Amino acid sequence: MTPLDPTRPEGSRLDLQPLWRRDDPDGRSIPALDHPWGARHRPDWQARGLVIWPRGGQWCRLRLTLACPPDWRALQQPRPRVQARLALRWWAECMELRVDGRAVHSGDLFDTGCRWLLPAVWWQGRPLQLELRLRSPRHDDGALIHSRLELEPLTAADPLGVLDPQRQQLRELRRRAGVDESPQAGAGFHVLGHAHLDLAWLWPVADTWQAAERTFASALGLMERFAALHFAHSTPALYAWLEQHRPALWSRLRQAVAAGRFEPINGPWVECDCVLISTASLLRQFQLGQHDSRARFPGLDHRLAWLPDSFGFGAGLPAVAAATGVRWFCTHKLFWNASNPFPHRLFRWRARCGAEQLALMTAPIGSDGDPLTMERHRLEWQRATGLGELLWLPGVGDHGGGPTAEMLEQLDLWNRQPEAAPQRHGSLRAYLAGLEPHAAQLPVWRDELYLELHRGCATTRPDQKRHNRSLERLLRQAELAGVLAALVAGPRARGPQPLPDWRPLLFQQFHDILPGTAIPEVFEQAEPQWRASRRAARRIRDQGLDAWLTGSGAGGRTGPADSSRQLWWAVQLQPLPVRRPSVRLPAGRWLSGDSPLPSQPAREGGTWVQLPPTAGVMAAPVWRQSGGARPGPVAPDEPPPELPTQAVWVDGRRAGNGALSLQLGPGGIEQLWDDQGRPQLAAPLAWCRHADRGEFWDAWDIAANYRSRPLPWRWQGQPQWRERGPLCAGFLWRGTCGASRVRLDGRLLAGSPWLELVLSIDWRQRHELLRLEVPLAERADRWAADTSGGMLERPAEPLTARERARWEVAAISWMASCGGSGGLAVLLDGPQGVSAGADRLGVSLLRAPTWPDPGADNGWQRQRLALLPCANGWRAAGVPEQALAFREPLLLRRGGHATPGPVSTTARAALPALPAGVQLLGLRPLGRQGAVISLINSSPCRQAVDLGPGWCIGGRLDGLDQPLGTAWHTDAAILPPTASGPAGQALLRLKPWELGFWLIRAAGPPLTVPAAEA
């Protein structure tokens, strides 16, 4: 490429790319564009005129002596009429611009451009010594994308016509778009300053607080200089931190909010991941975010959810958002689709239950004031929606920053040019209000918002997913235990009891923490927070359960100590259908009342015991007679142990329990049969290992061609039985994956409809993917899985390009095939990445990316799942309920020693089993009014839920605990004798797929319960 003569600028711009110099490998100074590395390794970038250097945090130093071209100096005579800016754009982890040895600007991967104003001495003829110091990203090669000088007029009149080239380009853009070359009536920009701020990503959380402080202070300062500027920011968690730790800045911010210049655009507590969290967590994100926003900014209407950067959105999100008062949903992320552009920019997003959000696909976040870029996006918006005014969001993002003075000056300059579409600064709420009249004519989207990218997020960093599900379970259980404790406390309750704090969990669900796509420091610092939150929630749960089980908070004995007989409680905190689980307990003889329970010595210590039947939320008392490691002999006057329900049998390489059976062999689990004897597998279960490299977004993305790059997985011999008995048959299989040791444990229990599999692995690989493939004996027509906010169903064979792009999706707790005569379900302790076809189900277990966390996934990992035959389909098999039972096993609580004499302890019952398809999202205290029960109907049928005689049903509520309809008792459905329930029975009615909330209280005396959260 021939270098441009710096004395001959092309119009009002001067390209500097050919003028930079750097040292070659021999230490000689050469033109930067001629450096041999770029031509060899990145010819595509070289062809675009980029200055390139290698990845891995390597430094590149560029130098340039910049003299003012004589033609430009003449423009300043007899008086200054123009100014010049140094416009740079880079792709570098760190950038510093030095002029005459003095640092004048810095940037990074997020602040990727500048328009530095050249000083007066340059116009007077003194050359400037420019130096650029750039450090390449760790994951990608570095580049100086463009560098040029740009002239600007000092007045909007532009007497020298220095803006004429851009004016002509604006006219050409419109001409190619088929519209008038001049701005049409109604065309324009609604300008709103913004700063996307990730709570953690390539920096720890502590940096985020500092970035937020800088960003908000900068925005408030710019408001004093630019009278039109409006600024908006999301995330209630940030505002809560600011109020507590920076009161002076918070006071300034509140004043700007009152003046209408600073706009909180909240929604959930943080900009959370919206496909990896359960419906209960998604609901809490919106509940806490909305409660906090209404309390902190009471003068504003908080009916919008700002989620520009989350990696896709489950189909149930509109129902959750609508239940908490949200009407508008705003995102930008679907512009990142790698295969199929999303078809709408403005639409109605409808959940299965009929709840809707008005949805806006915004222009890019982190934009600037370039008029050509702005007009290009505006024309695209106009073509997609028929509307002329585009929301424009200038501001440095990701690591905060917001709009800069340079951006605002450029915007102001072009707002005074008749060739550019006019701008008006204003709030997001005002812009959305202008779109409201078009709502009835908008297209309707009845599906998830699947991001055709970042498909590895459900699999990366399984430790974060494990922390998330365990803490969420403890928080729900702690709230429910508080309600149970209030059932027995009544008037004896002394003041408000502690309630679990959801905020640590919700914070860690941020869309770069839970997916595992941050630097290692983020996860190292999160670890003690996970542990502390679990301890606190467990303590509150246990206190509540003790109060419920003993009738007081003492949790004490039932009588004089008798060391030979101990009371234990088997506690079920999910309203599941009747079942008779088998669990491992401490060694001894176990009884229900005076009757021995079926038992079997456990190989790893303790005793397998089949408990009495459980149904609903309840606690069943069982008694332990200590007798060493094995159950003692039966006394002559003691009844023999009852026979196990669905006892396990083992015959050679086969085993079963009446609900399913399996066969082991050289291939591992070679066959599985349902209770009718129908085979489920077309071939043995396949544990697969693949190369997984080459994606730019390493931790985010699975290589699309991973199936074509298999790697060996070696097993040692055949699986071997380790336990054989009427309650448990267990096997063990060892192997290796490269340098990683693998152990597979399988277990079939009496009374269990599933085969449990636990894969333990010392994972040492890099850039590999570990998967389980389940070959189906019966071809599937469709498949289903649960997702955040509901469930999804898909054809087994994709029919459209959009369906083909969904080759990996996130499932929370189960997936199932649907064939002509049944299917097979995989229960997950997820979330997990899953896939399906007509002949297989697949689960992604582990990955090994190296950026941004070099050791992601490495170390000891334990993956737990189960196989469940569905003879008559997944609904008839109760797969959602079985997944709950699999993920949330019974709690065993030690009570005390028995009183000599007959046993009088009875079971505790709180809630009956819910109808098939209805799940409990939460049961939590609501001050002294009672409790709030949250239910979701995941079926296509209307449901009527009977809470039993122990509960009085008050009014129906919305998701923010506000009454719907009229007052207490009027929202209960009292069915006539001809209806599904007996006369006078109070039922909760749910429409298909509906989310519902009710105020309930214990029947009888007024209920005193823990105080609601502040």
What kind of region is each of these model predictions?
Residues 1-28, 32, 145-190, 199-200, ...:
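Histidine-centered catalytic/metal-binding microenvironments
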Residues 1-72, 273, 684-719:
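Extended carbohydrate-recognition surfaces in non-catalytic/accessory domains of CAZymes
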Residues 73-101, 569-575, 583-584:
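Aromatic-lined ligand-binding clefts that engage carbohydrates, nucleic acids, or primary amines
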Residues 95-146:
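Beta-strand-rich ligand-recognition modules
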Residues 274-295, 362-382, 729:
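Alpha-helical scaffold elements lining the catalytic groove of polysaccharide deacetylases
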